[in-house]
Amino acid sequence: MKVTQLLFKNQSLVVSGKDEIEDPLKANLILGFGSKRLVADEQLNSLLTDRYPSAEMLLCSTAGEIAYNSVYDDSAVITVISFEKTTIKIASLNLEGFNDSFELGKSLIQQFDITGLTSILILSDGLLVNGSQLASGMEASNRGNVLITGGLAGDGTLFNNTLVGLNSIPKTGTVAAVGFYGDSIDVRSSSVSGWDVFGPERVVTSANGTDVYEIDNRSAVDLYKIYLGPYIDDKTNSTLLFPLAVKLPGRSHYIARSILSVSHEKNCMIFSGDIPEGSTVRFMKANFEKLIDAADQAAKEISGGDLNYAPELAILISCVGRRIILGKQVEEEVGVVADYFTNKTAIAGFYSYGEISPQMNIGPCQLHNQTMTITTFNEI
């Protein structure tokens, strides 16, 4: 397995990090994370397909790009992979052809032959597609308990629309996936939050999908007015700084759900994923040091305690809310991950509108918010 990293800025591709793959014709896979403007750039698409004609290409818009220990804006981070012993298969569907995101997720996983399938990497539209329904649908078709990880595309802090593409110019509503086959590919994942929870446990008493109307039989909007104060109607995405810890019915662990908006017309809070009635919830707040520690913990967990673990590639997908909180210090959470791996490991990723991975690194994949989620790849 050989990995090349490129940075696309000012209409040119520059090798960043690892050296160029000796034979571009042997490249199997391209992963491109970039600003909406650049991933939809026909020149970039042409440059990549001309340079690596045999490679499958997945492109995804972001809320910031990650390359090694740096975070970029208005760029495209391109990772080119040449597998020596691993087979890949790709699939892509658009929400337009389905009744809901659950059915899309089910159908997407059914595109893959389960025999020899080790893991699947998912890149999804981050606004039109319901991430929690997508994850549930994928797991409904996950016959072999295959590891599924990935993330939801971003649009900076604008939240207008997001783009994903497979071997074509990216567009809205798309979910793309790549499956990895064979015994020679070692894929691992880890997802850690680092947010503090506070206050009593409460129960969601009225909700519909992502819309929460009542908590403890009290208006969720009124309750959040006490919590958020003037931020309740803030137009600068400050609500992203106040996620909700959610324990779904029948589950033992909390997951985070970001607030996307407040609907005074419907008198409800709108979250980034489904929160069913009967869910136990607690308020959350950011702790700068714990966010950084969480990124470090994610890197440590993925090694399984092996201090010599040095994967060829690490994909980092972190939430846009974390980026807003960390501000100018955002590279610190990327840096602690980079410090944990050796120079052998190529690091790429993006800031997302949601992360997809198992809960506590075991079991079915779920939609997460406010986490640092790492997926590593290594041929053995």
Language-model features, listed with the residues they occupy:
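Small-residue-enriched flexible segments
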Residues: 1-51, 55-56, 60-327, 331-340, ...
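Short beta-strand/loop segments at the ligand-binding rim of alpha/beta enzyme cores
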Residues: 344
